[in-house]
């Protein structure tokens, strides 16, 4: 089981989500997904079960029990966007999409506009997810520490690149500010050559990524 509600409660509070929604312009997306590999008797395609738009810590706290129950009942995983958006920017993207759909005569599945608008909306404080998979016969904590050291030495516009970390079902996620990817890849190649046991591929960098919030599969 993976339960990162406490980690991301602190994360979204630091990212500008207020205790209540009064006067708040910030919103974060939580998505409940049914993944094909978790449900072998169902179609392999990933399926979006439900989406929450959280604009306050109060709403976040009230959603926790329902999210856990849904995940357990239907074999879902809950993911949270690491990029907190402005409601105004999401609304502006919605207007653009609606206008383009009407102009093009595209009337199929209009209910997906908000989801897409959230993803398209700009983010003033961009964050990435570094997806680290556990490796057989390698201590995950040491592996994460070595990768963290590499990330912190890469050029960026911040004094510290790593914001926080969260366990995942198959490893660990590091939430970071953007950094020099070319430098990261070169340093990872050096690390892998120096420590021959690190034979896995370089961790994926998900630039508009989701991190795992909860799963009990």
Residue locations for each model-derived region?
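Signature for HUH/AEP ssDNA processing cores
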Residues: 1-168, 179-187, 208-217
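Short hydrophobic/aromatic beta-strand micro-patches
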Residues: 175-177
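Positively charged, low-complexity, intrinsically disordered RNA-binding extensions
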Residues: 196-207, 214
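A common structural junction motif
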Residues: 155, 188-200
């Amino acid at each position: 089981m993976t339960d990162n509600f406490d980690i991301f409660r602190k994360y979204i509070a630091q990212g500008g989500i207020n205790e209540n929604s009064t006067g708040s312009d910030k919103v974060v997306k939580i998505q409940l997904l049914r993944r094909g590999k978790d449900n072998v008797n169902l179609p392999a395609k990933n399926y979006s079960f439900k989406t929450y738009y959280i604009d306050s810590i109060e709403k976040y706290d009230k959603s926790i029990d329902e999210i856990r129950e849904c995940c357990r009942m239907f074999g879902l995983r809950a993911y949270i966007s690491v990029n907190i958006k402005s409601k105004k920017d999401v609304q502006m993207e919605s207007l653009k999409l609606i206008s383009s759909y009407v102009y093009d005569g595209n009337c199929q599945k209009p209910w997906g506009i908000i989801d897409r608008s959230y993803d398209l909306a700009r983010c003033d404080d961009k964050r990435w997810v570094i997806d680290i998979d556990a490796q057989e016969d390698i201590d995950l904590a040491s592996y994460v520490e070595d990768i963290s050291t590499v990330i912190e030495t890469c050029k960026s516009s911040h004094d510290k690149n790593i914001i926080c970390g969260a366990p995942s079902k198959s490893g660990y996620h590091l939430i970071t500010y953007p950094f020099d990817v070319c430098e990261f890849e070169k340093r990872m190649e050096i690390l892998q050559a120096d420590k021959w046991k690190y034979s896995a591929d370089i961790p994926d960098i998900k630039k508009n990524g989701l991190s795992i919030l909860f799963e009990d599969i």
